Amino acid sequence: MCGIIGIIGREDLSERLFQGLRRLEYRGYDSAGMCTIHDGKLDRRRAEGKLDNLGRVLANDPLPGKIGIAHTRWATHGAPTVANAHPHIAGDVAVVHNGIIENFKTLRDELLERGHHFESETDTEVVAHLLDEQMQAGKDPRHAVSKVLKKLRGAFALAILFKNYPDLLIGARLGSPLVVGYGDGENYLGSDALALAPLTQKISYLEEGDWVVLTREGIEVHDIEDRIVERPVVLSGASGLMVEKGNYRHFMQKEIFEQPVVVAQTLQSYLRPVEGQVALPDPDFDLSQIKRVTIVACGTSYYAGMVARYWIERFARVPVEIEAASEYRYREPVMEEGGLSLFISQSGETADTLAALRHARAGGQKIAVVVNVPTSSMAREADLLLPTHAGPEIGVASTKAFTCQLAVLAALATHIARVKGQLTQQEEQDIVRHLAEAPAALNAALAFNDTIENVATAIAPARDVLYIGRGPDYPLAMEGALKLKEISYIHAEGYAAGEMKHGPIALIDDKVPIIVLAPSGPLFEKTVSNMQEMQARGGKVILISDEKGIQEAGDNCLATLTMPKVHPLIAPIVYAIPVQLLAYHVAVIKGTDVDQPRNLAKSVTVE
């Protein structure tokens, strides 16, 4: 959600700023812009829409300069127009900003009363005016930034240029991530390590409330109390190759097909197949004393949490609640002693989830996190860090991060069950064996790609689509519906199969495809009964099951998709493949922007 890159160096850097924005495209955006200091003035270029539009602006009107900031904007305040695109300039100050300034209206009204005039509808322009006001009052950039930061409420990451200080680039963060990079005679700011990947591998993650002064010679970090502090310098490991599609048409397609490998990599960190054991990192607390688990997440991660609830309650016999992160803090949840709060996030920076984590921490809960970015804010604040190893996920619609989350959550459920004495050694060995089978089963599921592509032609014309499942397949139904909504823009809903007769069955007619997730097993017969109720009312069913299930129930279906026969434990991991591929192929047929669907952002860093 929005992206920032800033460079201070000794050579013209317009092209490097632009390529940095390319690496930030995956975060989602609807406009973009850049600003440098050149010949004693702030020089800016902006464009609405895709980066190619900004590229054309730069081709017609190049942007020289040896210090600059650049930004991709995902609209929060004001429409996605050129006037609202960043950077924003007020007098001698240029600013780019990720996040939301919650008290911007109050600040704006005060500035208007003092005679300021605004060119945009954004909250960001308020920051530029406040800083310029301080500069006009005789403050230097450091004092101006320190004073203005204390007036801002909300979540933000900022990069700031001062026209009369071409040897100074300032950044700040509170509730939104910002990384600094160390170069040779130049230094960098970025929203994440990927933005800086080809420029440097030496980075520092700023902490909450930090602000930083970059010169060509060095970097000076200040904490929230304005004290100069040191932040650890680490090697990022990020590579520009991570944001290339290779031979695939879309990043989403590439990431779907990477799942056998990345799930295997993830499981390798948590399974000891020879011993038949799950091995988790040692937490800072005793997991055997946990009395309740509260899972908190958003979007696809929330559905991974729903699956985990089945596993934890079944194996560990510990009660589990699951909460939407955006709602968690606002219902005054009861936090009992002995509670574990489990937070799931691909980026580890999701604003709602991070705020919920801090709320749970304040309530005395132990904190575990499942994240794909082990250097993220959530990772740094956890008592138990459980990283996935999916690698960077560029497509906005999550695919490989989801299946890796499921792999980690299955391992966690097994570990809790063992330390609480709920599993025999043989039962744990069986679970480990079945989890180890998941990568091969994912490969087998991907082999049906062509068949799934053909079935997608029956879904693409639909206005509405329903997904149903039972047990752990119910969250998969909801995830499948979300995927279709996200990238094809078709209205879709996921339901527990048994709930259809309690209202949603009224939607059934011959124009509404119904995707049924029903691997053969204990819940198969009941799911098929629900499916047949819909067929009796003209519903056009696409049944996803294994060979046995298709033989038993596939005769009257519009189409069937045969998945490999797998143990029920790993069915949610394997059955993610067909719902992801269905959504992908429908979106391709409809010609939508698969990797950057409208109105969506990869990392939602505002509440």
Swiss-Prot record:
Catalyses which reaction(s): D-fructose 6-phosphate + L-glutamine = D-glucosamine 6-phosphate + L-glutamate
Top enzyme class: transferase
Cytoplasm recorded as keyword: yes
Subcellular location as annotated: Cytoplasm
Active site (record annotation): 2 (nucleophile), 602 (for fru-6p isomerization activity)
Cited InterPro entries: GATase_2_dom, GFAT, GFAT_N, GlmS/AgaS_SIS, GlmS/FrlB_SIS, Ntn_hydrolases_N, SIS_dom, SIS_dom_sf
Signal peptide from the UniProt entry: none
Principal localisation: cytoplasm
GO MF annotation, one: glutamine-fructose-6-phosphate transaminase (isomerizing) activity
Enzyme Commission designation: 2.6.1.16
UniProt domain SIS: residue ranges: 283-422, 455-597
Any one of the GO CC terms: cytosol
Keywords, comma-separated and alphabetical: Aminotransferase, Cytoplasm, Glutamine amidotransferase, Repeat, Transferase
Domain Glutamine amidotransferase type-2: 2-217
GO terms under biological process: carbohydrate metabolic process; fructose 6-phosphate metabolic process; protein N-linked glycosylation; UDP-N-acetylglucosamine metabolic process
Classification via Pfam families: GATase_6, SIS
Subunit structure: Homodimer.
NCBIfam families attached to this UniProt entry: glmS, PRK00331.1
PANTHER family: GLUCOSAMINE--FRUCTOSE-6-PHOSPHATE AMINOTRANSFERASE, ISOMERIZING (PTHR10937), GLUTAMINE--FRUCTOSE-6-PHOSPHATE TRANSAMINASE (ISOMERIZING) (PTHR10937:SF0)
Primary role: Catalyzes the first step in hexosamine metabolism, converting fructose-6P into glucosamine-6P using glutamine as a nitrogen source.
Name assigned to this protein: Glutamine--fructose-6-phosphate aminotransferase [isomerizing]
Gene name for this UniProt entry: glmS
